[in-house]
Each structure stands twice: as C-alpha cells, then as structure tokens.
Amino acid sequence: MSFQIEYYTSAENKNDFIVEFTNFPKVLYADNNKINKLPFEIESLYFKLHHLTHDFFLIKENGVVVLRSMICLTPFPDLAYFGLLDFDYKNVKVKNILSEFKKMINSWCQIQGASKIYGPINFSTWLPYRLLSSVDGGPMFSFEPDRPIEYCQLLKEVGFTTNQLFSSKGYEELDTIINLYQSDYEKALELGFTFEFFPKELDLVDMKDLHRLSLKFFDDNYLATPIDFDTFRTLYASQSKKDDFTFSLFIKSSDGERIGYFINFIEHDYCVAKTIGIDKNYRGKGLSNGSMYLSLKKAADMGISKTVMAMVKEGAQSESYGRKMKHLWVHLYEILELSIA
C-alpha cells in the first residue's frame, strides 16, 4: 500500500500547498455544519505563527489528500506537538493512514531530537487543542473540540495514549451555590475588594490588564507558554464576536488594582464558567467564591438555572465547585501522546 507525503518546507509551490492544506477540512466536512471550517484568510495565518522548527504535511493516496497535520518543536526539552489534524476517519484504510502518520511523526522527531510528541495542540495551548473523547448527555458548546469522537478512538487504536484528561460538567440548582458563596462575596467587600463586570467591549487598558493577568495566572499551568499582546488581543476579539462576556468580571484590590478575573458567558441557557484566576498574593480570601456568587447571581436573575464548569483538568481544585450542585452530564477531552521509537 503506497501513500505519498508532501511537506510544506519542500513544496515547489508553497501557495498551492497552503490552499490544498486549508481546503482539506472544507472538502472532508462539506456536509457537516457542526464542524468549524475556518476561512482561508484565518487558517493560512498558521503558516506565519511559529518561530521554532516546524512543518506542515499532507498524506495522499493516489493523489487525494486523506490526512493533514502540522508538527513542531516546543519550548519544552525533547517535546514536539502535532496539531491542525484532520483525516478521513471513515476511510476503510484509516488505520493504514494513521500508521503512516505515526511513521512520519517518528521520522521527523528523530531527526529533530524530540523523544515525545503531544497533540493535537495547534502550536500552543492558547490556540485550539485537545480531542473530544466522551459525551454523556448535554448539548455541545462552541468552546469544545468539534472533531468527531472517532478521532481520539482511532488514534488510540494505532498506539497513541492519553497524556492528560479534561472535562466539562453540567450542573443545575444554581441557587445552592449562590446561597453558599454569598458570605464570601460579602466578606470580600468588607475587606475592601470590589468586582467590576466587563463592558460590552474592552478598551486598551482592559485588554492589557487581561493579558498581564493571564500571563501571570497561567505561568504554572500545564504546557503553558507566553503569548504576545497583539496575538492575545486578536484571539479575544475573535471569541468576543461569538460570546457575550458581560457576565465576566475583574476582581480589584482595596487600592483599585486589578488582581484577578472570572471569565464566563451564557450559551444554551447555561452560565459557562470558563476561567477563574487570582493573583497568588490574594488567594485564600474567598475571592473565587465571591466572583462566582456575583456572576451566577446575575445569570440566575435572568432566569438561568444551570452552569458548566468548562474544560477543567481532571483533579483540579476548580472541580470542587460542582460538588455543591446537582450533576447533569459530563464531556471528556484528551491530549494524546506518543513516545518516539
């Protein structure tokens, strides 16, 4: 069985390669409106993003693309990522296709000196990453990986293993947690802390504070890397076109300094709790609980009775919020890994 691999770095006509690479998911999922198919102008930007050694490649059978992906080195020693992965998962030869993918990964990583590869991660965890691996009820949300669940299953069947597990969990009975955390909110006010809801559109000062705090909060997060301000602002602007962030808020110290935030929004009649971050010098004062109280109360006052604890690393402290409410459903996601032979 013969497959052909084409690399961007060795392509004679790089513009044609970019068009073919970005067009593949549009062709593969032409009849599936649940799959996010980015316009060429957006996806082609990936070819200008990464400053470390990387490449893009296509696997073809008889001249027809059956898989696309990128591969890159990372700031972490001996570690590479694969990402932007799409493949013809319904193809009767799909395991042969993925075996060729593994072979290509092994060869590239051996040449570059990487001993392990994680993915899918589109260059960094600031950009889309993870695969959907399990759905136990509940609606699908815009922040979730949208590739078919078969991707994760099939990659495992050819030798990839779970590196890290994440979950989104749906709950109802918001009143329980609102009542429970009201005292934390009131205590925070007594200590001089204040909470400031996001405006409809963040100005330059707001964005710089959000960027500054994010770099500080995520520095110790799994696979965290820095992000420059312009890229951060572009990503936020793109997301804010889809989601209403006016339920989100900044947390301010008694001297008016922004020292934390709680990012959340409404989707499918759920209040989606996305990210809570507090400066480590102010932790242990109930500020996370206080911000949860204020945002969830605002949602409840509008008739929202359910919440999602979104994209949480399994075993993280933030999982504890859900133990106070009635559990409805869970969606699981994974980062996969492959040791280089």
Give the ranges of each region predicted by the language model.
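A conserved beta-strand-loop-helix scaffold within acyl/acetyltransferase catalytic domains
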Residues: I18-E61, V66-D78, L202-I278
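Active-site/acyl-donor-binding loops of N-acyltransferases
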Residues: S124-I177, F247, Y261-I266, V272-K280, ...
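Conserved acetyl-CoA-binding loop-helix of GNAT-fold acetyltransferases
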Residues: K93-S107, I278, G284-K297
